[in-house]
Regions:
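Active-site loop segments of alpha/beta catalytic cores
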Residues: 1-242
């Protein structure tokens, strides 16, 4: 921890140039969301064995606190560089402290550190998009306390445990929901009719109560048929009106 190199001026300039090029390409056809190395807990999972990490906040809370401070602070300069370079949103990985931990554990031991990082992002005028692609339902209410403007991707069963209609009712418009078409069993392996049916079902569930953005539940799988993606987009556009 003590001797980790700091972000260099050269890295900062490289970020500015890459974001400039991407935004120039995008023009008015989209926004640019950039990833950082996760929230504090996700970041810690890259340097600490997961089995140890999941017990650390109970077995050695003092060290856990130091670790979370370290994984927060090491990310701040990079996060600021992305925002100052023009990123429209910051995507924050939060899948490692997933729903299997339960709301009580998450809120007591994880949420305070994640919230501090989320606050840092949003105090600079950039919305934070919190990402949990695994079990999520037990934490849907907890994420209201997290303060992120957006939460995604609400992976449906069997990829995760999200039931979008239930989640929308819990959130009640307190944050934007992004989700949640099954990118494996529907977009990659499904028929056009299955894509249409699932898209309509997800769209209707999502826009029932509060702001909603439809997308695949996670990144597209390799060899996803282009015609399935086109059908997903066109069906979503036809059914997007509230």
């Amino acid at each position: 921890m003590k001797y980790e190199p700091v972000m260099t001026p050269e890295y900062n300039e490289m970020v500015k140039e890459k974001i400039r090029r991407v935004k120039e390409y995008l023009g008015n056809n989209g926004i640019l969301g950039t990833w950082v190395p996760g929230g504090p807990f996700n970041n810690a999972s890259m340097i600490i064995n997961h089995s140890d990490l999941y017990m650390l906040f109970m077995n050695d809370p003092e060290y856990f606190d130091l670790l979370m401070q370290f994984t927060t602070n090491r990310t701040l300069p990079y996060t600021k560089a992305f925002i100052e370079a023009g990123a429209d949103a910051m995507l924050v990985g939060g899948n490692v402290p997933g729903g299997f931990l339960g709301a009580d554990i998450y809120e007591q031991f994880i949420l305070p550190y994640e919230k501090k990082y989320i606050d840092f992002i949003q105090e600079q005028g950039c919305p934070a998009v919190y990402h949990n692609c695994g079990q999520i339902m037990s934490l849907v209410g907890s994420y209201k306390k997290l303060g992120a403007r957006v939460v995604e991707p609400f992976s449906p069963i069997p990829l995760g445990d999200a039931i979008l209609a239930d989640a929308v009712g819990i959130v009640n418009g307190d944050y934007v929901i992004i989700g949640g078409i099954d990118q494996v069993n529907v977009l990659q392996k499904g028929t056009l009719e299955q894509v249409r049916k699932s898209t309509i079902e997800i769209m209707e569930a999502g826009k029932r109560n509060g702001p909603f953005i439809i997308q695949s539940a996670d990144f597209l799988e390799y060899n996803t048929p282009l015609e399935n993606v086109e059908e997903f987009i066109s069906t979503a556009m036809r059914n997007a009106a509230y």
